[in-house]
Amino acid sequence: MFAVIQTGGKQYKVASGDVIRVEKLAGEAGAEVVLDQVLMVGDKIGVPVVAGASVKATVVAQARGEKIIVFKKRRRQNSRRKNGHRQDLTILRITDISAG
């Protein structure tokens, strides 16, 4: 069975046993997380969420994404700015999908 969940403003299609990278969630490695913004479970489609459905996951690690370079330049003005950014991520392992 699969589910579509929403966390951090993004949607993810998950199945039991999947490992996904999501926007930072509170919790140390080994902590249990319950995601209740379930948009779809199997053939049930929520309006906007499926009532009573939840997805349980275990935090594998807290990590950081790859560095993104932000470069801004104004032409002919000798004006430029370069910044780097690394997003904080949480790596989750999906343990259980409950249809509710």
UniProtKB/Swiss-Prot annotation:
For whether the record's keyword set contains Transport, the answer is no
MF annotations from Gene Ontology: rRNA binding; structural constituent of ribosome
Q: Which InterPro entries match?
A: bL21-like, bL21-like_sf, Ribosomal_bL21
Give the disulfide map: none
Q: Name one Pfam family in it.
A: Ribosomal_L21p
Gene Ontology CC terms, in alphabetical order: cytoplasm; ribonucleoprotein complex; ribosome
Q: Does the keyword RNA-binding apply?
A: yes
Record keywords, A-Z: Ribonucleoprotein, Ribosomal protein, RNA-binding, rRNA-binding
* Entry's Gene Ontology BP terms: translation
Question: Belongs to which family?
Answer: Belongs to the bacterial ribosomal protein bL21 family.
How would you summarize the oligomeric state and partners of this protein? Part of the 50S ribosomal subunit. Contacts protein L20.
Q: What is this protein's function? A: This protein binds to 23S rRNA in the presence of protein L20.
Its protein name is Large ribosomal subunit protein bL21
Protein species of origin: Paramagnetospirillum magneticum (strain ATCC 700264 / AMB-1) (Magnetospirillum magneticum)
